[in-house]
Regions:
Chain A
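Conserved acidic carboxylate
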Residues: 9
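C-terminal output helix
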Residues: 107-116, 128
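The feature encodes the CheY-like receiver
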Residues: 15, 57, 75, 87, ...
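Charged docking surfaces used in two-component/phosphorelay signaling
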Residues: 16-24
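Active-site residues of response regulator receiver
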Residues: 53, 83
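Hydrophobic residue at a beta-alpha junction
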Residues: 32-33, 56-59, 68, 89
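Short hydrophobic/Thr-rich beta-strand motif most characteristic of the beta2 strand and flanking loop
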Residues: 26-33, 41, 103
Length: 131, 809
């Protein structure tokens, strides 16, 4: 059984790239183009990992992360922020909002999966390795 | 005269007095009638006239009835022998007696009127009055009345002038001879007699008798022999004795005439006139002389009395005292005065100023004393003399010595040295002048006012100048007059509450021209001309007040300006802040917007090269790698530019982390390992064990080390890159050592400038933005550390960073 990854990203190219990369790396990918959809999708499919863009329409990544962390059913899912917000303090802001990891764009396909999985909790990493 | 009258009244009973007057008058009249001209009552010497005048003078006007009665009886007696009918004799006697009485009354009245001495014969003035009024004028009245009435009743007008003249002369002689004896006898002091005096008297009487006999009964021409005899009497005996002697001589003279007359009837009248003149002149001469002598004697006596009375007191006084008589001859002096003249006090009597002083000085003293005697008033003077260059002051007091009549008979002079007092006074005066000067010329306006009435007592010149009032105007004013209405009441209250030295506060004063000035005053109580007063110093603070107001205004203005400026700055600051925020937002947006397309470029090329979508031929791979490389270069360029911009805009915020440098270096090695491996270079780390954790910005420290390591790898073709970490001087030192090209010494300084890559020739060979070292240097500075380089061409370079263990940026 594949791990489920939810990607919340408004940029179609990025969405396509991450989806392609994750699928190629044996992930089941769910897509959401805004925050509300993302939270709905997370509620419905209960992903193993959430890749979260920060700059999003209507509801930004920080808000989504906080919302997710406030949900009892979802607060254990690792959230990895993938963002072009590479300014000083952005990382800290992201982590403070509840994210588990931070990968700045542009991503490097050579080590992206490795970096993402380095933020996984032990139990999830074991499951991933068993696959 | 009061005294004499009361003495009389005591001695004699009034009634006895009257009887005595009548008897004596009548008896002397009987005697006189013996010598009377035939058929008349006119006698060559009419003694009763003297008795009448003396009685009125001594006992007063009230005794006149006795005189009248006696005169009437005497006349009656005298006329009864005439051929006139009795009633005529009666009337004639009454009229003649009236003349006799009037004679005494008028004579005595006139003498008393002009002489204030009870005994007129004691002074020259009184004696003159006695002779003129009593002996010459008054008898004329009696003679006129008597002669005229006699001729009317008898009708013997042919003897009128002869009668008148004899009557007048007879009365005159009677008065001149008898009145002085009675008057002088009244005051005569018998106790002054002693044996010596009595012996002299006996001798004198013998001489007198012998002389009289010689003259009147033998050699008539020797009449001048009387002169020494009478002078003896005058000088050696008193007035009374002399009067008696005059009477004796007169009696002898008349008796001799009568004796001669019997022998030579033809010459009788003529001889009587001659002897009358002789007696009259002798009497007058000796009356005058004796009065003068008496006056002198009495004056001498008074002086002597006044001297002896205070003698001991005067002797002991420190003052110098002398007494001069009215002729300015010294009479006496005390020892101090004698010492001044270098003589004994006993030697002074009889001397004058001429005996002691140079003539001009003596002349001067004489003039002063004469003027003093003439004024008769007490004189106090201060005399200044200069002797041997020294100034001496003498206080001189001259007191007139007066006799019982108030006439000045001498000078009592008292003088003493007051030089010291004068010097003290002068000193005082100078002092006073000094302080007066201090007050009057004081540049501060000063005023003195009465504490009770608040009236001005004095003000100084500065005050007059300041306020414009004249001195007279000020002295008519009160303190509140200077103040505006609204301050007057408060001022009076304050003025009454001040004590001692006090600050009187801030007030307004109105000057004469109406202008108002602001003042402050300080005052002090003082005693001014024996009244409670207060001196106040006034300071005009009008200008200061104006300046204060101006300053206040300026201060306000400044405050406003500051407020305005602050507001402006606030706005500017807000603007700047918003510009900063704008810049931050711009940088963030740029960063974000540039990364998004790069994400696709780098991401997709990466994925294509992984051949995830499908297999690629070699040419495709080669081209995709080139694309990937360009994308990565572009990304690092963007990162560097953003970093530099942030640093220069002050937008780079540093975080404070506690970390181990070994971890950071391991991360760098891990990250750079693929690059080193690709160039076949050895990348190693050598970290001193037990390095302490440091406090700094971990991300930035790592960024700098990555930069240095990547640079080293970039410029090294063969060999190795080594990273060392060690502790040195409480600083963490990280060295990145390569075996690369090395850097020329003159290039080293340029290294850390932006967009510099050493040797533009190889620049193109080594890709990079040229910003790395510049950013690294700036970051190190921000972190409180430093970066430096050591290099040797062709051998390699060593980049060294030093970081404080505990950062406090």
């Amino acid at each position: 059984m594949k791990l489920k990854a939810l990607i919340i990203e408004d940029n179609e190219q990025n969405m396509y790239m991450l989806s392609f990369l994750l699928e190629k790396n044996n992930y089941e990918v769910f897509q959401a183009f805004n925050g509300l959809d993302g939270i709905k999708a997370a509620t419905n499919c209960l992903p193993d990992v959430i890749l979260l863009d920060i700059q999003l329409p209507e509801m930004d990544g920080y808000q989504i992360a906080r919302e997710l962390r406030n949900r009892n059913d979802l607060n254990t899912i690792p959230i990895i922020a993938v963002t072009s917000h590479a300014m000083v303090g952005d990382r800290e802001k992201v982590m403070a909002s509840g994210a588990n990891g931070y990968i700045e764009k542009p991503i490097d396909p050579d080590n992206f999966i490795q970096r993402m999985e380095s933020h996984f909790p032990k139990e999830l990493l074991q499951r991933r390795n068993q696959l | 005269m009061e005294d004499t009258k009361s003495t009389f009244a005591k001695r004699w009973h009034w009634f006895i007095l009257l009887i005595l007057i009548i008897l004596s008058y009548y008896s002397t009249a009987k005697l006189g009638l013996i010598f009377a001209f035939e058929g008349t009552v006119a006698s060559p010497v009419w003694m009763p006239a003297g008795i009448a005048l003396a009685a009125i003078l001594l006992a007063g006007y009230r005794v006149w009835p006795a005189i009248y009665i006696a005169a009437f009886l005497a006349n009656l007696q005298g006329l009864i022998v005439s051929e006139l009918p009795f009633h005529s004799i009666l009337i004639l006697s009454l009229i003649t007696a009236m003349g006799n009485t009037l004679e005494a009354l008028i004579g005595a009245g006139l003498i008393s009127r002009f002489s204030n001495n009870p005994n007129p014969l004691e002074t020259l003035k009184g004696t003159t009055l006695f002779i003129f009024f009593g002996a010459l004028l008054a008898p004329l009245i009696a003679a006129l009345v008597g002669s005229s009435s006699f001729c009317i009743f008898t009708n013997h007008w042919e003897i009128y002038d002869h009668l008148l003249l004899n009557w007048w002369f007879g009365d005159t002689l009677g008065i001149l001879i008898l009145a002085p004896i009675i008057i002088n006898w009244n005051q005569y002091k018998f106790n002054e007699w002693n044996y010596l005096k009595f012996a002299e008297l006996v001798g004198f009487i013998i001489v007198l008798g012998f002389t009289s006999y010689l003259i009147f009964f033998t050699i008539y021409n020797l009449i001048y022999l009387f002169i020494p005899v009478l002078l003896w009497s005058i000088f050696r005996f008193g007035k009374f004795e002399t009067s008696v002697f005059v009477l004796i001589i007169s009696g002898l003279a008349l008796w001799s005439i009568m004796h001669h007359a019997i022998n030579n009837a033809l010459q009788q009248n003529e001889s009587i006139l001659v002897i009358q003149s002789f007696v009259g002149i002798v009497a007058i001469t000796f009356l005058v002389l004796s009065s003068v002598i008496y006056e002198r004697k009495k004056m001498q006596l008074s002086l002597y009395e006044s001297l002896t009375k205070h003698r001991s007191l005067l002797e002991n006084l420190p003052q110098k005292i002398f007494v001069k008589n009215s002729n300015l001859i010294f009479v006496s002096c005390n020892e101090n005065f004698a010492k001044e003249l270098n003589i004994q006090s006993s030697e002074i009597a009889g001397k004058t100023d001429y005996d002691f002083f140079p003539i001009d000085l003596a002349e001067k003293y004489r003039k002063e004393d004469s003027a003093f005697l003439a004024s008769g008033k007490l004189l106090e003077t201060e005399v200044c003399e200069t002797r041997a260059g020294q100034t001496y002051w003498t206080q001189v007091v001259k007191v007139p010595i007066k006799d019982g009549n108030g006439s000045v008979i001498g000078i009592q002079g008292i003088f003493w040295d007051i030089t010291k007092r004068k010097q003290a006074e002068e000193l005082l005066r100078l002092n006073e002048e000094k302080y007066r000067f201090l007050f009057e010329r004081n540049p501060v306006p000063l005023l003195i006012y009465d504490t009770e009435t608040l009236k001005f007592r004095a003000v100084n010149e500065a005050f007059i100048k300041q306020y414009g009032f004249s001195m007279d105007e000020v002295l008519a004013m009160q303190l509140p007059d200077l103040y505006p209405e609204e301050e007057k009441e408060a001022l009076v209250e304050v003025a009454q509450g001040l004590h001692g030295h006090a600050y009187a506060g801030e007030w307004h004063h109105i000057r004469k021209d109406g202008s108002v000035i602001s003042i402050i005053a300080t005052s002090h109580d003082l005693d001014y001309m024996e009244r409670d007063a207060r001196i106040a110093a006034v300071t005009d603070i009008t200008d200061r007040k104006l300046a204060e107001m101006e300053l206040e205004r300026y201060h306000k203005h400044l405050e406003n300006m500051v407020e305005e400026r602050t507001a402006e700055l606030e706005i500017a600051k807000e603007r700047a802040e918003s510009a900063d925020q704008l810049k931050s937002a711009f940088l963030a947006t740029m960063s974000h917007e540039l990364r998004t397309p790069l994400n696709s470029i780098i991401g997709f090329t990466g994925m294509l090269l992984q051949e995830l979508p499908g297999p690629l031929n070699e040419e495709q791979k080669k081209q995709l790698r080139m694309t990937q490389k360009s994308g990565r270069h572009l990304l690092s360029l963007i990162n560097d530019i953003l970093d530099l911009s942030k640093i220069e805009a002050g937008q780079l915020n540093l975080s404070t982390d506690r970390f181990k440098i070994s971890e950071v270096i391991q991360n760098v090695i891990d990250l750079s390992k693929p690059f080193a491996t690709s160039k076949n270079l050895l990348l190693t780390a050598e970290i001193e064990p037990d390095l302490p954790e440091i406090t700094s910005d971990q991300f930035r420290v790592q960024q700098v080390i990555i930069n240095l390591v990547n640079n080293a790898l970039k410029f090294t073709e063969v060999g190795s890159v080594k990273v060392e970490a060690l502790l040195q001087d409480k600083h963490l030192v990280v060295r990145v050592i390569d075996t690369g090209l090395g850097i020329e010494e003159n290039q080293i300084t340029k290294l850390f400038k932006p967009f510099i890559q050493i040797d533009s020739g190889i620049a193109r060979k080594h890709e990079g933005t040229g910003l790395g070292l510049s950013i690294s240097k700036k970051l190190m500075t921000m972190l409180g550390g430093s970066i430096s380089v050591e290099s040797e061409l062709a051998k390699g370079s060593t980049f060294i960073i030093r970081l404080p263990l505990d950062n406090n940026y």
